[in-house]
Amino acid sequence: MYFDKSKLQKMSDEITLTLNERIDKMELVVKAQSILIGQDERGNSYQSNILRLINDMARGLLNQCQSTMHSHRVQRNYRSTESIAWTIEEFDNYIESFNTTTKLFRDTLERFWPTRNFEPMATEAKISTVRVRFEYLRDELIKTSQAG
C-alpha cells in the first residue's frame, strides 16, 4: 500500500527510535556479559573462552543490527510500508538470534557455575522485536489515510 511521503517519513522516524532503543539494550547486554566473563578468577579458563565465543556471537549480531539501522537511516524516502517491513524483518531476525545467544550464555554460565547469582542484564534480558510496533504504526497510518 502506498501513502503520502510525509506520513511514511513520520512512520520511518518512529521506527528509527524503536530500533535505537533495541540497539541500546543489546549494547548493555553485551557489556554486562563482558563484565561477567572478566570476573572469572581463573582468568583464561576454557569456561571463559567458551563464554567469550558466545559473547562474540552476540556482539556480531549487535553489529548486524547496527548495520541494518544504518541502512534504514540512509533509505530516507520509502515508497511503501512494505519496504519498511523488509527492514523490520531483517532486524527482528537478528534480535531473535541475539535472544537465543543470550539464553545460550545463561545456560552455559549455569552449567559452569551453578551456585552463583549473575547480573540479570547479562543473562535474562530479552530484547523485544520491532514487528509489533511496526504493525501498530502501519494500522494507524491506514486508519488515518482512510479517514482523511
Task: Map each language-model feature to its residues.
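Long, low-complexity or tandemly repetitive, helically biased scaffold regions used
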Residues: D24-G148
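Leu/Val/Ala/Ile-rich N-terminal alpha-helices, chiefly Sec-type signal peptides and the beginnings
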Residues: M1-S34
